[in-house]
Amino acid sequence: LLSAPMAEQPDIIDLSLPLNGTPRFSPEDVCLIAVPCFGGRAPEIALERLAQTQGGGARAILLSVYGNRSDEDTLFELKGAAMRAGYVPMAAVRAVAQHSIVPAIAAGRPDEEDARRLAQFGRVIRDRLTEPNAPPLSLAKKGLLRPFGGLPVHPRAGKPCTGCGKCASLCPVGAIPSRDPSQTLETLCITCMRCVAVCPVHARRLSPLVVKLAGRKLKKKCARRQEPELIF
């Protein structure tokens, strides 16, 4: 949605999986660096893999996606990581998607209004990047980076699991054994919920009680609709 006005067929590097080699860029390149927000922070594994790339002075647009509560200082953290990897951040976007733990929160998002605004942001960023003296991103820190130690709950596979292994092959941190994909290695799992999203038979899920309790806790904090935000 955001990149469409800037590139019809962008090259995609998936930071959710181990990198194959070292991606290298140059000042002629424009990179959209996107991460989800976990507890107000950028996922450590995403930042580690970003550090394995070589920005080479490429201009970067930063994107933080959160579940309608707050992304806190995710973008500030991502900006620092991008600069250390050799990128030059030029713009940043906060966007909302359906909450990964409690799908009833921000259900159906990004929706049509989100799509319209993100496409508009893409056009504005595209035009900005053509300006010869466009300044780099100015992004103030909201507060102290709040520690996030992960969640004490993890998805498990139920009886419908066919053992196809798709979840194991796509787990960002290798927390699902390929020989027994019905299991979850809790010491590795970051509760990103990717396994739940990709399971073809919907066998993986969190405990319904956990989802219900989390929904009660987040209901007030997430009641007001948050809108996408563009920052220069």
Region locations from a protein language model:
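FMN-binding flavodoxin-like domain, especially the glycine-rich phosphate-binding loop
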Residues: 1-14, 25-150, 207-232
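Short gly/ser/thr-rich secondary-structure transition/capping motifs
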Residues: 11-19, 178-181
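Structural motif
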Residues: 19-25
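A mid-sequence, solvent-exposed acidic-amphipathic segment
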Residues: 135-172
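Iron-sulfur cluster-binding cysteine motifs and their immediate structural context
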Residues: 157, 162, 166-190, 194-211
